[in-house]
């Protein structure tokens, strides 16, 4: 199944369905990756009576669009399109990882959508280390003269997981890319900052998870968001985990925590 965006792009979607699901998890994946990397997550939830639906973000995976480039508002609109396409008569849970965590969290805060809640994994609310001033200046300049130019996203595959098989599969995956545009990185950083500043606008329950050894997105920013959001945000910290909790050697523990939260 595919979706057609307002500006004419085709978005690729996937569904892992069970009969009479008690809930459906709606995935927004991270930067440079694609929804196919979550098949094991989908299968886990299927085994527990929960359907799983996903789409490849524009410029990612099997979807159309320039690799690594999008206007932030376009992605918000694409999430709306995706959610509206789902014909389930059961609670929806928005699940976003990394950049997808940034998008999902902003979507929940800005739109208060008709969902039961959200699972937010290692969201890109800020970088672990502040961007050097000269690089920030260059990005702002490029945003004016060449906003969609493809730059390297700087993600070190060795930092996504402590599981070498996961890293090797990521590196060899032809649908994974390492691109990002000046416009998208600046808009995403601004959106992460906005989410932190507006955490008290949270009106839906969320499970926020993050590994303490994440060197790709800021663990401290997640801590701060949880503190500001209050009781609707349950924060679960994983000591020593890298960027992708669902792909760590202890992933069964992470998935069990997600399921427990859903059932609670």
Describe each PLM feature range:
Residues 1-18:
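N-terminal cap/lid segment of alpha/beta-hydrolase-fold proteins
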Residues 37, 42-66:
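Conserved alpha/beta-hydrolase
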Residues 32-34, 61-86, 91:
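Catalytic nucleophile-loop/oxyanion-hole region of alpha/beta-hydrolase
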Residues 232-264:
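Catalytic active-site module of serine/aspartate enzymes centered on a nucleophile-bearing elbow/loop
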Residues 202, 208-210, 214:
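Short beta-strand/loop motif that positions the catalytic acidic residue
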Residues 204, 218-227:
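Short alpha-helix in the alpha/beta-hydrolase fold that links the catalytic acid
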């Amino acid at each position: 199944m595919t979706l057609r965006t307002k500006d004419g792009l085709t978005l690729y979607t996937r569904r892992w369905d069970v009969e009479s699901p008690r809930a459906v998890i709606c995935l927004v994946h991270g930067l440079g990756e694609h929804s196919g990397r979550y098949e094991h997550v989908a299968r886990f939830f299927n085994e527990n009576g929960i359907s799983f639906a996903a789409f490849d973000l524009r410029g990612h995976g099997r979807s159309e669009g320039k690799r690594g480039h999008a206007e932030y508002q376009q992605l918000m609109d694409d999430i709306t399109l995706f959610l509206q396409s789902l014909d389930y008569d059961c609670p929806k849970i928005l699940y976003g990882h990394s950049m997808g965590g940034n998008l999902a969290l902003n979507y929940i805060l800005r739109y208060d959508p008709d969902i039961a809640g959200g699972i937010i994994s290692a969201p890109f609310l800020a970088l672990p280390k502040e961007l050097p001033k000269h690089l920030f200046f260059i990005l702002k300049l490029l945003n004016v003269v060449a906003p969609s130019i493809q730059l390297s996203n700087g993600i070190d595959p060795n930092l996504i997981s402590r599981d070498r098989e996961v890293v090797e599969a990521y590196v060899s995956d032809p649908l994974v890319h390492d691109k990002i545009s000046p416009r998208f990185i600046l808009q995403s950083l601004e959106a992460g900052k906005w989410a932190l500043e507006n955490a008290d606008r949270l009106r839906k329950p969320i499970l926020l998870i993050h590994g303490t050894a994440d060197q790709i997105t800021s663990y401290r920013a997640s801590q701060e968001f949880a503190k500001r959001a209050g009781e609707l945000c349950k924060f679960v910290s994983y000591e020593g985990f890298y960027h992708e909790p669902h792909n760590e050697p202890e992933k069964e523990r992470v998935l069990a925590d997600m399921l427990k939260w859903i059932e609670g």
